[in-house]
Amino acid sequence: KRRKIKFVQADILNLDEIKSYIKEAKVVHHLAGITNVAYVKKESNPGQDENIKKVAIEGTENVLKSMNDNATIVFPSTHVVFEGLKKPKKNVDENEKTSTFLAYSSSKVVNENQIINSGKKYAIFRLGSVYGFSTDTMRMNIMPNLFSKIASQNGTIKLFGGGVQFKSLVPLIDVARCFKFVEESKKFNNGIYNLTKENTTVKEVALICKKINPELKIIETNDEVPNKGYTLSNKKLLDTGFEFVNNLETCIEEMITKWSYEKFDKNLEYTFKGVR
């Protein structure tokens, strides 16, 4: 059954514009923010960084000010609050000290603390890399989606350092399901939760793509990988009773199938180096 949704376009930095709408809500899903962000240090610039921080921090403050005292805020944070970890680490839990250096992740840490200290009821989710088919282009550079796109066109994936980097992933539909689950469950009591399903490597994702489309070409380089990264533990989330219903291979197969009919450069070659 389709729900009727009232849409209001307003500026999150304008408290007067948003307050009258937010104050009536029992649950606030705070997804507003700048999504065109740098993935690595060399891609960032001061102007962009300042805008990311302003929208994230001032916007969240306005949302919290607008909420009524009995409302709950559901907030999507990010796995990259650990991007500054110096050594590889598996199954990082919610008690691990955050370590950031980019504006996006640093702002998320500030947001987490704003929410925790606000006195409001909350559930904060540190999302893994969110994959899965959608009609927008926002997540096209997320590694599983990008690899699926390349595979759908019989392209070439070049794996930097053999693709040994660790990745924590989560299906898009399950993220939405989890946010809905918060509204229905009484087990989320002012906590931070890692919202991830699969812990894998870049190479393993590429191999799934090749399993689905054997025409895909994979090239591995011998470059040294200074830090393989980290993975997140989802034990705390699973203890609430939430269950995932999607998986990586099924979602990749769906993306490859749906994108395989588009015209595309068959000679495309892509090298994966990023951290998303």
Regions found by a protein language model. Name each.
Residues Q9-V55:
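NAD(P)H-binding glycine-rich loop region in Rossmannoid oxidoreductase-like domains
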Residues L13, G47-N62, T98, L102, ...:
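Glycine-rich NAD(P)-binding loop of the Rossmann-fold in SDR/ketoreductase-type enzymes
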Residues L13, V81-F82, V130-G132, V175, ...:
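Conserved sequence/active-site signature of Rossmann-fold short-chain dehydrogenase/reductase
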Residues H30, E58-A103:
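Conserved Rossmann-fold NAD(P)-dependent oxidoreductase catalytic core, especially the SDR/UDP-sugar
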Residues K89, E96, T100-S107, D136, ...:
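The catalytic Tyr-centered alpha-helix of NAD(P)H-dependent dehydrogenases
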Residues N113-K167, L172-A176, C209:
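NAD(P)-dependent short-chain dehydrogenase/reductase
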Residues G155, F160-R276:
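C-terminal substrate-binding subdomain of Rossmann-fold SDR/epimerase-dehydratase oxidoreductases
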